[in-house]
């Protein structure tokens, strides 16, 4: 199972729980999970992260961005299907509001059985149009999703994660 991360997962982790300079183990773990194809971030989502932000700077270090980048192109037909799940007649302002989220969802839709979206957006099923949350669009399209803490639990993150690796450096 590959978990596709929304940018807000990294932003919230850095701002609230695991600052890059205080909990480097978390950020090293993300790279490791990217290298083992358990966590990936579509290029459209990586592009949402500003280069001058702490996360943007971290992504530029070593091979961090390359380790996490999902190496495939979006299916534009699926992107259109996702956009229609927000509303069939979004205006230009609404397109700007939803940002790159339809790409994230489309990548998961391309392989529903093997992909789960990770987002910090809480479900709000009554919201409409561009205000819809990733989780609610995923529910409508039958795409798996979870929040950051569910991901951390399923993937068994601890700050001592390296000690769980076997003698060959593989988990």
Model regions: which residues?
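Active-site-proximal, substrate-binding regions of enzyme catalytic domains
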Residues: 3, 7-115, 123-124, 128
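Hydrophobic beta-strand scaffold residues
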Residues: 115-117, 144-145
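Acidic, PIN/NYN-like endoribonuclease modules and their adjacent C-terminal/linker elements
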Residues: 2, 123-171
């Amino acid at each position: 199972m590959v978990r596709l991360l929304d940018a807000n997962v990294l932003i919230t982790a850095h701002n609230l729980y695991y600052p890059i300079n205080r909990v480097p183990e978390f950020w090293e773990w993300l790279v490791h999970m990217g290298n083992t194809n358990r966590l990936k971030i579509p290029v459209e989502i990586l592009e949402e992260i500003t280069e001058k932000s702490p996360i943007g700077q971290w992504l530029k270090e070593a091979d961090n961005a390359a380790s996490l980048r999902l190496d495939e192109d979006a299916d534009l037909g699926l992107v259109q299907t996702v956009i229609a799940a927000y509303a069939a007649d979004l205006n230009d302002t609404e397109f700007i509001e939803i940002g790159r989220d339809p790409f994230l969802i489309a990548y998961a839709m391309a392989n529903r059985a093997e992909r789960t979206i990770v987002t910090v957006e809480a479900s709000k099923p009554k919201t409409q149009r561009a205000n819809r949350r990733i989780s609610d669009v995923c529910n409508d399209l039958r795409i798996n999703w979870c929040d950051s803490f569910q991901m951390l639990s399923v993937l068994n993150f601890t700050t001592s994660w390296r000690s769980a690796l076997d003698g060959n450096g593989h988990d």
